[in-house]
Design a protein with these regions (language model features):
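Jelly-roll (double-stranded beta-helix
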Residues: 1-413
């Protein structure tokens, strides 16, 4: 109804100390890191989504439009008569606790835990809470945009389908009076190079009656993801569970991949089914929306819903001791049977995987909710190597190979 340029000049606002827009002064570490859930603000500390953002790690800077930032959020207040415009990058919001009602210039989106939302750079929006508190994760990319991964040999069907991404229906607010403070002007918070600025305008920023185009916020219900998996043997790379990606100019690498580990059947035979111990060139920030991750036990002292972990490039990691021993005990029975099993319906873990090495924010590295004993989850790992059984397996494999060679020779003759 009125153009967004109709506002007073921006002036610097107080930027929370735990919100970062560049990471040159953050620290790097090859150690495995884990955090318990981000503490929620107390009732006497009203905190909205913007001021509840808590930067965990990142690479590059918003100023260079290069890299990314990983944040968590915990808030207990809706954004009333205000909005956020993020000039720094595109946001992927992953609610873990508490549904969000997101107002934008394009309309409304209901985003409960189990769904995710992408907010493009430069769109004005406000986050309202549908419960007393809310908590979750945010991936902010300074370069590129989220897109569906190239499915390659998978073909047309699988993973996240384009038809399941939902855009808001046009909705508008025709008012020139604040709901919370009649007579006051609306507040526009502008995030620019990691700093917050503020301007006032005499009308609601959500006064767009209709829109068209392909640059808009959207949400996705993670239960609609169609997982692919190994159906014979071995353990596929987690990239096979990619929902969205922000590719780099270098083929095979990404500014960030958003990967989920949803309920699914695990059927591989003669295989250690959980993610095995490994090192890789990517950096992995993991979160847990609900349930239990198959390679880490949940509960106090474990990987809790709302918690997070970080494993950097070439740092070894894998199942904790309890998960490892449980899988060894599950192995093929004495009769050779190796039945499938289904991961619980209430599980939903995810990963932000990135090619750029993350630097950890000082406040996150020294946080009281950081699990400094994380490394102890691998204490007690022991060898199950059986020399005699291994020798028999090698001999049996050699015999099978000799038999196949003999058949080929007969056919050739």
């Amino acid at each position: 109804m009125r153009p967004s340029v109709t506002h007073e000049p921006f002036s610097p606002s107080v930027t929370p100390e735990h919100l970062l827009g560049e990471f040159s002064r953050a620290s790097v570490t090859p150690n495995q890191l884990r955090w318990r859930p981000l503490p929620k603000p107390s009732a006497d500390q009203p905190t909205d989504f913007v001021h509840g953002l808590y930067s965990m790690c990142g690479a590059g800077s918003a100023a260079d439009k290069s890299g990314y930032a990983v944040h968590m959020y915990a808030c207990n207040q809706s954004m009333e008569d205000s909005c956020l415009c993020n000039a720094d990058g595109e946001l992927l919001v992953v609610p873990q606790e508490g549904a969000l009602r997101v107002k934008s210039e394009f309309g409304l989106l209901h985003v409960p835990p189990g769904s995710v939302m992408v907010m493009p750079r430069g769109v004005r929006f406000a986050v309202e809470l549908e419960s007393e508190t809310a908590r979750g994760y945010v991936l902010e990319v300074y370069s590129g945009r989220f897109e569906l991964p190239n499915l390659g040999p998978i073909g047309a069907n699988g993973l996240a389908a384009e038809r399941d991404f939902e855009a808001p229906v046009a909705w508008y607010e025709e008012t020139e009076e604040c709901h919370s403070a009649p007579g006051q002007s609306f507040r526009v918070v502008h995030k620019f190079e990691g700093m917050l600025f503020e301007a006032r305008q005499p009308f609601s920023p959500f006064n767009v009656v209709a829109w068209h185009g392909n640059y808009y916020p959207y949400r996705y219900d993670l239960s609609k993801f169609c997982p692919m998996n190994a159906v014979g043997f071995d353990h596929p790379d987690p990239s096979i569970f990619t929902v969205l990606t922000v590719p780099t100019e270098r083929p095979g690498t990404a500014v960030a991949d958003f990967v989920i580990f949803p309920p699914r059947w695990s059927v591989s035979e003669a295989t250690f089914r959980p993610p095995y111990y490994h090192r890789n060139c990517m950096n992995e920030f993991m979160g847990l929306i609900r349930g239990e991750y198959e390679a880490k036990k949940a509960g106090r002292g474990g990987f809790e819903p709302g918690g997070a972990s970080l494993h950097t490039c070439m740092t070894p990691h894998g199942p904790d001791t309890t998960s490892f021993e449980a899988e060894v005990a599950r192995g093929p029975g004495g009769d050779g049977s190796d039945p499938p099993h289904k991961l619980p319906l209430n599980t939903m873990a995810f990963m932000f995987e990135t090619y750029a090495t993350p630097r950890v924010a000082a406040h996150a590295a020294g946080a009281a909710h950081r699990d400094v004993d994380y490394y102890k989850c691998w204490t007690g790992l022991r060898s199950h190597f059986d020399r005699e059984a291994a020798a028999k397996a090698v001999a049996a494999a050699a015999a099978r190979d000799d038999g196949r060679k003999g058949k080929r020779q007969k056919v050739t003759a």
